[in-house]
């Protein structure tokens, strides 16, 4: 079972994917976490690309990102959750090739939505050191634009569920579980 979560920064993707991972006992992979881990481990290609792209609110090159993700996916088989991948048309093309090559399909895509006001509140509370709010806003603008083709593709497949991410963690989780159960 492959489940994908997409949404803007601070929409609760990490919280909800981790809860669902525990509930279903399947691993979750976050592009952001994989990139931050490689950055902390001083992976030269990632460090340079992160400075060039992410600090300006832009996506890292797809082949660089997907190489990190593919290493993890190849270890787990056909049951996993993805946090914010695919996030662009380019991501989607590479991911579709991966799915085809491995005979896999996506079960459900959960799109978490929040307002800019809520995003700012969560940003202030979370206070991640590597971000400032203007970069986060720019990242959201770019990601919202890039995500359109991804959302349309999964909507056309009939596997997209849009969930309001502004409720309590429990309320959002309940709605996600309801969406997943209605897919059966």
Where are these regions (language model features)?
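Glycine-rich phosphate-binding loop of ATP-dependent small-molecule kinases
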Residues: 1-184
């Amino acid at each position: 079972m492959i489940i994908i979560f997409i949404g803007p920064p601070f929409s609760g993707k990490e919280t909800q994917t981790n809860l669902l991972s525990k509930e279903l006992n399947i691993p979750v992979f976050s592009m952001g976490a994989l990139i931050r881990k490689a950055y902390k481990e001083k992976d030269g290609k990632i460090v340079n690309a992160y400075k060039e792209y992410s600090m300006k609110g832009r996506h890292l090159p797809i082949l660089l990102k997907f190489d990190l993700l593919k290493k993890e996916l190849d270890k787990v088989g056909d049951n996993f959750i993805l946090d914010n991948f695919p996030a662009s048309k380019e991501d989607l093309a590479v991911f579709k090739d991966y799915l085809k090559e491995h005979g896999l399909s996506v079960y459900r895509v959960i799109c978490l939505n929040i307002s800019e006001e809520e995003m700012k509140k969560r940003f202030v509370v979370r206070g991640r050191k590597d971000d400032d709010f203007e970069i986060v806003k720019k990242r959201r603008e770019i990601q919202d634009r890039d995500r359109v083709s991804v959302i349309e593709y999964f909507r056309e497949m009939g596997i997209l569920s849009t969930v309001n991410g502004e409720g309590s963690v429990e309320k959002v989780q309940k709605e996600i579980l309801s969406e997943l159960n209605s897919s059966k």
